[in-house]
């Protein structure tokens, strides 16, 4: 995580700008005075910097929830803020002079809104969930230039490594997304995808609810796969294989191909290591045979007239509201100069979204972006609207 270790935190003039970075407003945590969020705009990216101003720790870093795809814009924002306030930097992991030309402007890296607004219309599309080193994804893309590959990963170093290779090799048929694949699949149009690769997912033996393969995931895979499309699981965990097989076979109608220790054209560096250790590998490939109805969701993320005053909004901190398939949890509350802001987790129990909601002048809106359009998020928004506005 990019950060600056500073001698003393100083507030920047609001609103102001420096070196192409705009400082929009500051949100102050209502329960932890040492924590502040600074709203930043760099190019088309809008996000928060997080300031921690404790006696033993004074840091300025990017806010995890709103961190943009471009790490360069985060670096630029941190250094510009420090320069604008003349802060003394004790130590830093932010490069001040060196710039990786392979990562500075990468068209392959996309935000979730890119897919939510207009999903790619390529004739053949494949998805890889958790691409790791990217070796398999790069191999597939280079050998199938007419197919669009969407690589989904939440590990930032893996993303940066893949983007560098895409730039060096000048590959134009890969799109990269830093997002939860389970949520992403909820916005994919029906019958659109040729293949879904899930290679060596984390087994999560102690937290099975976090596993990628689940009944809900398979249902979404069946919906978005075209007829003859496949979901391919590859794992070295016998427990995960057994669990996945039982989950697949529980469907009333399904076609599966099972392989053990199958050789494939390209392997990851971890797979090479595990082969030397003589570990077993299991493949479960589900073949879709049904056409699904078009995706249809009703509702929006607009708020009605807010009836709570600023202090009542602040007092929602730590409260939770539940509904049949999800919840809303008010994780943080913040004071603004002209209102309040909430950090909420909402949606499905197993795959919630974490968002900010600004409330001022009897109006409310999500910041810096609205939730992903999904059934559980629309239901959660309806409940949140009721809390704030009814």
Curated annotation (Swiss-Prot):
Q: Which InterPro entries match?
A: SAM-dependent_MTases_sf, tRNA_(Gua-N-7)_MeTrfase_Trmb, tRNA_methyltr_TrmB_bact
Q: What class of enzyme is it?
A: transferase
Q: Which GO terms describe its cellular component?
A: tRNA methyltransferase complex
- Pathway as given in its UniProt record: tRNA modification; N(7)-methylguanine-tRNA biosynthesis
Cited SUPFAM superfamilies: S-adenosyl-L-methionine-dependent methyltransferases
- Annotated GO MF terms: tRNA (guanine(46)-N7)-methyltransferase activity
State where S-adenosyl-L-methionine binds.
128, 153, 180
Q: Which UniProt keywords apply?
A: Methyltransferase, S-adenosyl-L-methionine, Transferase, tRNA processing
| Sites where the protein binds substrate | 206, 236
Q: What is its EC number?
A: 2.1.1.33
- Entry keyword S-adenosyl-L-methionine: yes
- Catalytic reaction equation(s): guanosine(46) in tRNA + S-adenosyl-L-methionine = N(7)-methylguanosine(46) in tRNA + S-adenosyl-L-homocysteine
By sequence similarity, the record places it as follows: Belongs to the class I-like SAM-binding methyltransferase superfamily. TrmB family.
The function of this protein is: Catalyzes the formation of N(7)-methylguanine at position 46 (m7G46) in tRNA.
Q: What is this protein called?
A: tRNA (guanine-N(7)-)-methyltransferase
User: Which species is the source of this protein?
Assistant: Sulfurimonas denitrificans (strain ATCC 33889 / DSM 1251) (Thiomicrospira denitrificans (strain ATCC 33889 / DSM 1251))
Gene name of the record: trmB
């Amino acid at each position: 995580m990019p950060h600056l270790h500073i001698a003393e935190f100083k507030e920047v003039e609001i609103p102001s700008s420096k070196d192409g970075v705009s400082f929009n407003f500051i949100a102050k945590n209502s329960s932890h005075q040492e924590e502040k969020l600074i709203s930043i705009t760099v190019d088309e990216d809008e996000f928060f910097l997080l300031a921690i101003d404790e006696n033993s720790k004074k840091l300025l870093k990017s806010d995890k929830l709103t961190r943009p795809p471009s790490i360069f814009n985060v670096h630029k924002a941190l250094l510009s803020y420090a320069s604008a306030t003349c802060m003394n930097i004790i130590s830093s992991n932010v490069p001040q002079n060196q710039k990786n030309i392979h990562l500075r402007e990468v068209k392959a890296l996309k935000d979730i809104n890119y897919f939510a607004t207009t999903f790619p219309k390529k004739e053949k599309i494949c998805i890889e969930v958790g691409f790791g080193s990217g070796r398999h994804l790069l191999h597939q893309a280079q050998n199938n230039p007419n197919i669009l590959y969407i690589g989904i990963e939440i590990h930032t170093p893996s993303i940066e490594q893949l983007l560098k290779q895409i730039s060096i090799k000048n590959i134009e048929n890969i799109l990269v997304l830093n997002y939860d694949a389970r949520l992403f699949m909820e916005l994919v149009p029906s019958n659109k995808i040729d293949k879904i690769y899930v290679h060596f997912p984390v087994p999560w033996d102690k937290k099975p609810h976090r596993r990628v393969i689940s009944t809900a995931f398979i249902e979404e895979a069946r919906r978005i796969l075209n007829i003859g499309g496949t979901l391919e699981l590859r794992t070295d965990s016998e427990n995960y294989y057994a669990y996945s097989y039982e989950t697949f076979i529980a469907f009333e109608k399904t076609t599966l191909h099972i392989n053990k220790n199958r050789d494939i054209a390209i392997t990851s560096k971890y797979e090479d290591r595990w082969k030397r250790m003589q570990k077993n590998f299991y493949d479960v490939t589900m073949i879709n045979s049904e056409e699904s109805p078009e995706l249809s969701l009703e509702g929006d993320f607009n708020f009605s007239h807010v009836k709570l005053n600023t202090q009542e909004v602040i007092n929602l901190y730590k409260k939770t509201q539940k509904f049949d398939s999800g919840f809303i949890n008010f994780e943080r509350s913040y004071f603004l100069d002209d209102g309040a802001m909430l950090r909420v987790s909402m949606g499905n129990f197993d795959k919630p979204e974490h968002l900010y909601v600004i409330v001022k002048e009897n109006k409310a809106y999500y910041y810096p972006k609205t939730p992903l359009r999904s059934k559980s998020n629309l239901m959660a928004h309806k409940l949140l609207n009721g809390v704030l506005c009814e």
